[in-house]
Regions:
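Phosphate-binding/switch region of NTP-binding enzymes
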Residues: 142-265
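Long, well-ordered amphipathic alpha-helical subdomains in the mid-to-C-terminal portions
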Residues: 253-283
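The Walker A/P-loop phosphate-binding site
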Residues: 1-91, 107-111
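Terminal-proximal interaction/regulatory segments of ATP-powered molecular machines
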Residues: 273-305
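Catalytic P-loop NTPase motifs of RecA-like helicase/translocase cores
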Residues: 76, 127-128, 177
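Phosphate-binding/switch loop-helix module in NTP-utilizing enzymes
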Residues: 96-165
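A short alpha->loop->secondary-structure connector
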Residues: 62-64, 84-91, 135-144, 185-189
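Short, ordered loop/turn segments at secondary-structure junctions
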Residues: 72-74, 96-97, 124, 173-174, ...
């Protein structure tokens, strides 16, 4: 528990801002994801949820945060994490699905008063209490999965500190049939929703026109749509945009997204197939080649605008 007496001159804890690899998402969130908060990324398969988190972790490492990765899918690989820019000699990797065991393993890290940590739970959907595995019937009590998630989240949120911790959660999508029409939601719905400061939905476009393939027909670039479903950072609920994930490289095409936003904001002027910025002009969006100075100027205008 944190008590701040303003009469005594005590100040609120300061947060740090960890940028995401998406220019548009940073713009909507006020620079990136804030420390001392919980952030949920959910959406369609292969929409780059884990890739996005690895890039955020890489940025956090440059700011002195140590990664703690709870890998309930047993999918973590050093090679891919390194492709995303992470220092793979630094993280603590916890692989498992039983909530009690995971909490026991990471509690010393949560209670650490000196080191800053960034936690990644990938994914929420696989975590269960020991009751599920211990009982012969699988602990099929009504709402066990939802209670398990709520128990786990409340334990973690208790250790949040604005200066020291930031938590990323990945969840799969589910179809909610409780209303008149089916809707897509993050798995475990309200239980997860109430404990999150930011909820970001990622949706992979399956349009062939928005995919790029190499000569062997392997997909080299795909467009991913994002939307902010909940945020405690700034008034940007409902804001949406897109970025491009590069599945073969383990990357996100920041430059291409920046150009798209600059064209939408008319920072780069488009006339037919020609694009103009200052005295420079290019024929076709794929031929736009920004210098370092131009890249910096456009980035500043996009983030401020």
């Amino acid at each position: 528990m944190l008590i701040i007496d303003k009469r005594k001159g005590e100040k609120m804890p300061e947060y740090e801002v960890i940028p995401t690899p998406s220019v548009g998402l940073n713009r909507a969130l006020g620079g990136g994801l804030y420390s001392g908060m919980t952030h949920l990324l959910w959406g369609t398969p292969s929409s780059g949820k884990t890739t996005m988190c690895y890039h955020i972790i890489a940025e956090a490492q440059r700011r002195g945060f140590r990664p703690v990765i709870i890998d309930s899918e047993y999918s973590y690989k050093d090679k891919y994490a390194e492709q995303c820019g992470m220092d793979v000699s630094d993280p603590v990797i916890v692989q498992g699905t039983i909530i009690e065991d995971i909490l026991k393993a990471i509690t010393p890290l949560l209670e650490d008063q000196n080191e800053k940590h960034i936690y990644l739970i990938d994914s929420m959907s696989n975590l269960m209490k020991d009751e599920f595995y211990a009982k012969p019937d699988g602990g099929k009590a009504l709402g066990l999965a939802a209670r398990s998630q709520g128990y786990f989240l409340q334990k973690l949120v208790n250790y949040l500190h604005k200066e020291r911790n930031i938590m990323l959660f990945v969840s799969h999508q589910m179809v909610d049939l409780s209303g008149m029409y089916p809707i897509l939601r993050g798995k475990y719905g309200n239980t997860v929703h109430h404990n999150m400061h930011n909820i970001i939905k990622l949706f992979l476009s399956m349009s062939q026109a928005e995919m790029e393939r190499d000569k062997a027909k392997m997909i080299t670039s795909q467009k991913v749509m994002w939307s902010i479903e909940k945020t405690k950072q700034r008034a940007s609920i409902g804001t949406s945009g897109h970025y491009y994930v590069l599945p073969q490289e383990g990357g996100i095409d920041t430059l291409r997204e920046l150009i798209d936003i600059a064209v939408e904001m008319e920072i780069i002027e488009r006339r037919g197939a020609w694009f103009y910025y200052g005295e420079e002009k290019w024929n076709g969006a794929g031929n736009i080649n920004l210098s370092d100075v131009q890249h910096g100027e456009i980035s500043s205008k996009v983030l401020v605008g």
